[in-house]
Amino acid sequence: MAKIRVYELAKELNISSKELITLLEEEFSVEVKNHMSAIEDEDANLIKELLSGKEKSEKTKEEDDEIETTAKNPIKESMNNKKSNKRDDKNEKVNTENAEDMGIITMTSDTITVKEISDKLEKSYAEVIKELMLMGVMASVNQEINFEMAEKLAAKFDMEILKEDEDEKEDLEDILKDNEEEEYLQKRSPIITVMGHVDHGKTSLLDAIRKSKITSTEAGGITQHIGAYTVELNGEAITFLDTPGHAAFTAMRARGAQVTDIVILVVAADDGIMPQTQEAISHCKAANVPLIVAINKIDRPGANIDKVKQELTEYGLVAEDWGGDTICVPVSAHTKEGIDDLLEMILLSSEILELKANPNRKAKGTVVEAKLDKGRGPVATLLIQNGTLRVGDSIVVGSTYGRIRAMFNDKGRNIESAGPSTPVEILGLSEVPEAGDKFYQVKEEKTARGIADKRKEKIRDEYLQSTHKVSLEDLYNQIQEGTVKELGLIVKADVQGSVEALKQSLEKLSTEEVKVRVIHGGVGAINETDVTLATASNGIILGFNVRPDNNAIIASERDGVDIKTYRVIYDAIEDIKSAMLGMLEPEFKEVVIGTAEVRQVYKISSVGTIAGAYIQTGKLARNAGARVIRDGIVIFESELASLKRFKDDAKEVAQGYECGLSIEKFNDIKEGDIIECFIMEEIKKKTL
């Protein structure tokens, strides 16, 4: 059903928004928050009719009085009519001004400059500054004033000011107001999260369930990022989320628990309850999510199912066969024993939960994972929790938006639409969203862009906080001197899941002396914008599996910003921890001596892959360390196996020259790759 905003109806009725809001509450018992609230057209028409009838009644009474007065004194009436006409014209003008809602203006953040509010008020700078002076505030054109001051200033000019994020909230409420009555709801598939300690066999269990090999393709057999998969059993679908088991990825596990219906807690029969198992249990209890325990590795010689059940009772989980209500299923991912029993228990539990959704409403759900793909742009894995998402739909995701250009299911097949409980990979977003962000389908891309822009502006304003410079090496001294009360970190990684994990782990390091705050986290190479943000907020930049580009390196050297890069997530955490405790004593420092761009690639059967490269900065030296960087992400790290200038071996090749090179144990060099050459330089130990 169509709706109309309060301010629009006020204009039609020729009254102010405030008057209409009061009227709605007192006479019609309709509660509205502000002028941007929407009411049904049916209610609006009723209000118009009632007010119209009231006006007619008053008008008839006035006309009767006028006839009586005219009969008594026709000359006086003639003069009064002239005055009355002028008065009516004047009143009409005032009412017209009121109908424009006293000139309602909006603010997108907590502060606004004098120049901006002058433009919004359509007043000269001098008038606004004069009013501020009368209020006891001395402000220049570019100076900012807070919302309270702006509100008082607007009132001086008979204007009303509102924060735009309230409007945004109402916009989304209107967009998402769909009928959720029982007749519209249909049964949906359960969403299952698999949790547990590292090496207890979560991925192997999923592998056994899906009857496909994914464990062998992942480094070290450990799932590094959340994946979503759908399997079918007896014609019924089940959606699985696979969350990593490392303690550092607590945030990713917590995110999984928020979108799941049932948790499968994997516990190794030969290992029992471990730290990550305890954390998983805590997340399930906090989210009030039903839990099924899969006791894995029952084929191992040291397996003890009863011992696991005994340990579970310490956390309030009593097995059904022990008189409790926790479902425990012994399984073996290796021999496939108990897999069917586990799936049956999942379907049985989902039937008890009576999971339902409305597939005919606008889609909404959660971002499971997001990344930047070289050929396809921003790619996001979405889990649809309600409604149906189609190719061509416009969506808003956190502070980004887009129109879906293509959609793929978990098998990689191109699909046109997807309903509740379905994981999909989509293309078409303007930027890479945050993992865990909610997404909402909106009517058109313009609406999505508007909401995303408001959110982005708010986030940007929160970033720009500044203090003084700090580096990791002298952090402890500055803490002791009291010059550092807050350590700001900018975290960049190759995928969003790693950003979130680092953020969660780093912020836990806060102490009474210094608070650790991740002021920004993003996906992709470290760029100049990150350095600018670090400069403004006195931050340190941490890179995980990514490298800074040339502009970022130049800017960091110019502004004195510390950039640290890591391949292992725990090294980053330990470095910050050690620096804060005053135990950071580096023995070697990495020095980048040069970079080269691969212009051409030659494959020689007896030798391997040879790259023809152009030295962009510094120099390349034989036997020095070398990294292969593709799209800002470190692909491989080793050392230069050979370095030639024409046909001759060269010890080093300087900037501006071309050379031929090969990387030790690496043959997948491609045109456009950047080769970064570095040496490890010994430095004196520091006592911080």
Swiss-Prot record:
Protein residues bound to GTP: 196-203, 242-246, 296-299
Signal peptide (residue range): none
Keyword Zinc found: no
Renumbered residue ranges of the record's region G2: 221-225
Region (Disordered): 53-100
Keywords of the record: Cytoplasm, GTP-binding, Initiation factor, Nucleotide-binding, Protein biosynthesis
Subcellular location: Cytoplasm
GO MF annotations, alphabetized: GTP binding; GTPase activity; translation initiation factor activity
Region (G3): 242-245
InterPro entries according to UniProt: EF-G-like_DII, IF2_II, IF2_N, P-loop_NTPase, Small_GTP-bd, T_Tr_GTP-bd_dom, TF_IF2_bacterial-like, TIF_IF2
Limits of the tr-type G domain: 187-354
Top-level taxonomic group: Bacteria
GO cellular component: cytosol
Segments for region (G1): 196-203
Chain segments carrying region G4: 296-299
Positions of the UniProt region annotated as G5: 332-334
UniProt biased composition (Basic and acidic residues): 53-62, 86-95
Recorded family membership: Belongs to the TRAFAC class translation factor GTPase superfamily. Classic translation factor GTPase family. IF-2 subfamily.
Function comment: One of the essential components for the initiation of protein synthesis. Protects formylmethionyl-tRNA from spontaneous hydrolysis and promotes its binding to the 30S ribosomal subunits. Also involved in the hydrolysis of GTP during the formation of the 70S ribosomal complex.
UniProt protein name: Translation initiation factor IF-2
